[in-house]
Amino acid sequence: MVSVQINDNESIDKMLKRFKKKYERAGVLKEFRKRAYFVKPSVDSRLKRSRCKRRAQRANEESNS
């Protein structure tokens, strides 16, 4: 669980910014979306391969440009 202590003379906005950063770095939302429903291991590996292909194509296009 992500928690943030408010420091002396710190505004609520700064405290919220720190909380949001910690929240993103911890990967809470990403993990929640991943566990929202079950994905079979075979489907997961197929999706991983397609993501890698797309990433490689983008990198290749950027290097050629």
Swiss-Prot record:
Cellular component aspect of the GO annotation: ribonucleoprotein complex; ribosome
One Pfam family this sequence matches: Ribosomal_S21
Listed GO MF terms: structural constituent of ribosome
Keyword line: Ribonucleoprotein, Ribosomal protein
GO terms under biological process: translation
Disulfide bonds: none
Family listed: Belongs to the bacterial ribosomal protein bS21 family.
This protein's name: Small ribosomal subunit protein bS21
Lineage: Bacteria, Pseudomonadati, Chlorobiota, Chlorobiia, Chlorobiales
Gene name of the encoded protein: rpsU
